[in-house]
A protein has these predicted regions:
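Glycine-rich ThDP/TPP pyrophosphate-binding loop and its adjacent helix/strand module
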Residues: 171
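A glycine-rich beta-to-alpha transition motif near the start of alpha/beta enzyme domains, typified by
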Residues: 1-166, 175-189
Length: 189
């Protein structure tokens, strides 16, 4: 294995949220789906994520993506999301920033202009974009199906004590906390 690895990246942001698209030096990932490839990446190549997302090349809010050929020929491309917290199954702002960069820089070539079928580890995401000349002006995505995964779970926290929460899925799992006796609301923190 060579002692030096070179990656090409293009940085952008989505309303201030950073996204770094790795455009060169991407390794082969084993797996038949993006979910399997994500797992392989996390188990064998996480040094790439930490090297590109953390200081001195990144920062604590850095997000990024890597583009791959699709597994299904009906789709336009596949994507792996990397960030400081790990490899997300789906990332909304990362999708918007990546599509903008990828279309403007010619990294992906849509089968149907203005519309993309993107394979993410979370599943198929449909993307519409508007372009004026070479500039992408807007990106709209239809995410994977959302669902309520758990309702009324009781958890114990060090700072707040017992809380009742719901867990929802929308490409990632999210904890939903309504105001309650131990938690009056985010505006108090």
């Amino acid at each position: 294995m060579p002692s030096r690895h070179t990656f090409s990246c293009i940085d952008a942001h989505t309303c201030g949220n950073p996204v770094r698209v790795v455009s060169g030096g991407i390794p082969f990932l084993k797996g038949n789906t993006m979910l399997e490839k994500r797992q392989y990446f996390m188990e064998n190549l996480d040094w790439i994520r930490t090297g590109l997302m953390f200081e001195p090349r990144g920062h604590d809010m850095m997000s990024g993506s890597m583009l791959f050929p699709p597994h299904d020929p009906e789709n336009d491309f596949a994507i792996l999301f990397i960030e400081t917290s790990g490899c997300l199954p789906m990332c909304g702002h990362g999708t918007i920033g990546t599509i903008t960069i990828a279309i403007e820089e010619g990294l992906i070539h849509p089968k149907t202009p203005g519309f993309l079928r993107m394979e993410a580890p979370a599943g198929l995401v449909l993307v519409e974009y508007k372009q004026e000349g070479k500039k992408v002006k807007s990106v709209k995505l239809t995410n994977v199906k959302s669902f309520l995964a758990a309702e009324g779970l009781e958890i114990e926290t060090d700072e707040l004590g017992k809380l009742t929460v719901d867990v929802a899925y929308g490409g990632n799992f999210y904890c939903i906390v309504d105001p309650q006796e131990n938690f009056p609301g985010l505006e108090h923190y």
